Amino acid sequence: MTVSAQNLVWIDMEMTGLDPEENVVLEIATIVTDKDLNVLAEGPVIAIHQSDEELAKMDDWNVNTHTRSGLVARVKESQYDETRAVAETLDFIRQWVPERTSPLCGNSIGQDRRFMVKHMSELEAFFHYRNVDVSTIKELVRRWQPELLDQFTKSGSHMALDDIRESIAELRFYRSHVFKI
């Protein structure tokens, strides 16, 4: 294990909805890659306990998706609160990157950052202010090379660790097909 400012930290969170003012985090997962997108380590995958009141705020899509994946049951059984989830995630990340060096990496990662600012500010503060957002590249490909879109498909499991693995694979695909690296 080598701490390096070149390593990239990938995070995905599942939430009860899209509004950090009204919704809460259900799950957080982390993966660290090197600069070439080789996975160095998978961090903790943490379901965060939320009250029945918070879970009741979910719309039908979230209820169906997170119940089908088993996440709702894991959240109800979890002993983790947001503070403990942040502490364990930071303990893992600090083994791989110095503070404020890694951009926050993922798909639509700006949404995760919004939830971090509201609910996990200590974790958000650990990251560089920049993002590596795979969805930005996808939106550009949709406009400039739409023929590539069908060549990469995701499962859409909406399980945090699976979503990160798919985001890394998607960026590898774009690196080889769009950037030709």
Curated annotation (Swiss-Prot):
Entry keyword set: Cytoplasm, Exonuclease, Hydrolase, Nuclease
E.C. number(s) listed in UniProt: 3.1.15.-
Subcellular location: Cytoplasm
GO terms for cellular component: cytoplasm
Exonuclease domain location: 8-171
This protein's record includes keyword Ion transport: no
Superkingdom of source: Bacteria
MF-aspect GO terms: 3'-5'-RNA exonuclease activity; nucleic acid binding
Active site (catalytic residues): 129
GO biological process: DNA metabolic process
UniProt xrefs under SUPFAM superfamilies: Ribonuclease H-like (SSF53098)
HAMAP family: Oligoribonuclease
Homology family: Belongs to the oligoribonuclease family.
Function according to Swiss-Prot or TrEMBL: 3'-to-5' exoribonuclease specific for small oligoribonucleotides.
PANTHER family: OLIGORIBONUCLEASE, MITOCHONDRIAL
Protein name per its UniProtKB record: Oligoribonuclease
Species assigned in the record: Aeromonas salmonicida (strain A449)
